[in-house]
């Protein structure tokens, strides 16, 4: 899979340039629903589900589409570790990685989250398509 990343990134670059998306270096972390907790409500008020993620809403507005090399997510949540970029600062090896945004990908289970994290690099280039940038009403974005 890792051999395909350069090709996928090139394809995303061509698509992103045409669609007006913005490329960003991101430290992608994972979180999951705790079996004992009742609520799965995100900071945006939406019910969390697979395909959602937490972002810094000052950098990536809620409702934005996040395109990873092998999937797409919707920004609906946030948290202090995401805003403070804790994971990027702790695991960075280069100046670019120290400046990376953090995207925290939501999974329904711990097993799914850990499996995905183990099979993907910590840092990756993502494409962000914001409803604000595309002129889409945020309340209509999913």
PLM regions: where:
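Hydrophobic h-region of N-terminal signal peptides that target proteins for export
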Residues: 10-19
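Solvent-exposed, well-ordered loop and adjacent helix/strand elements within mature globular domains
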Residues: 19-142
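Sec-dependent signal peptide recognition
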Residues: 2-9
């Amino acid at each position: 899979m890792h051999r395909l990343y350069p090709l996928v990134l090139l394809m995303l670059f061509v698509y992103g340039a045409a669609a007006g998306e913005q490329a960003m270096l991101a430290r992608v972390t994972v979180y999951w629903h705790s079996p004992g907790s009742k609520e799965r409500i995100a900071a945006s008020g939406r019910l969390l589900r697979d395909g959602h993620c937490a972002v810094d809403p000052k950098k990536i507005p809620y409702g934005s589409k996040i395109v990873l090399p092998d999937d797409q997510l919707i920004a609906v949540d946030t948290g202090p570790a995401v805003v403070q970029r804790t994971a990027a600062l702790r695991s960075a090896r280069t100046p670019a990685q120290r400046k990376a945004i953090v995207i925290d990908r939501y999974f329904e289970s711990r097993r799914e989250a850990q499996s995905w994290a183990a099979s993907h690099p910590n840092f990756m280039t993502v494409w962000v398509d914001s409803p604000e940038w595309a002129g889409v009403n945020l309340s209509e974005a999913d």
